[in-house]
Amino acid sequence: CGRRRGSLAWPDASSPSANPRPGAGAAESSACTTSGWSRWRTSLLVAGALLGLQWLPQLAGLWVACFGFGTGACIILALMFMGLRTENPRQAAALSGMAQCVGYLLAAFGPPLVGGLRDRSQDWNPALTVCLVLSLTMAAAGMLAGRNRRIRSASTAASTPAAG
């Protein structure tokens, strides 16, 4: 696989390396072969945008654009990893349902909580700091989710003898 696949936003996101699934398509190959840096740099873009809003608010347009690109890329990668890291469609559906439940709960309660924090402190810095910590947590989760591993079902794990 000597070809490089990428996009305008992340031209090196699909560095060539061994793909765990033979015959994988471009998107699957890209997600499976991204380097450690590529997997979590979208979350770092979000973190950088939040830091920029705190330190250089006069460039808010730039930081909001970076935040939008970063969060958009994060959701695409999250959805892609759910399908790529599971063994079958049923497992992918279960993982997707769990992740979307948590995601929608955060989407429902996060903005009012952050808004309440902003109202209570009369400053955006504490709210932006909370979001920064969450984006760094998301970067760590992205590193774990992007590892070249599969989520094994309980029945597969039980039928496979333990190594060692």
Swiss-Prot record:
Membrane topology value: Multi-pass membrane protein
Major site of localization recorded for this protein: membrane
UniProt entry keywords in alphabetical sequence: Cell membrane, Membrane, Transmembrane, Transmembrane helix, Transport
InterPro entries attached to this UniProt entry: MFS_Cyanate_Porter, MFS_trans_sf
Entry GO CC: plasma membrane
UniProt region (Disordered), positions on chain: 1-30
Protein name: Putative anionic 4-hydroxy-benzoate permease
Transmembrane domains' residue ranges: 62-82, 97-117, 126-146
Source organism (scientific name): Thauera aromatica
Subcellular location field: Cell membrane
Family: Belongs to the major facilitator superfamily. Cyanate porter (TC 2.A.1.17) family.
Entry superkingdom: Bacteria
Function: May be involved in uptake of anionic 4-hydroxy-benzoate.
Entry keyword annotation includes Mitochondrion: no
PANTHER family: 2-NITROIMIDAZOLE TRANSPORTER, PTHR23523
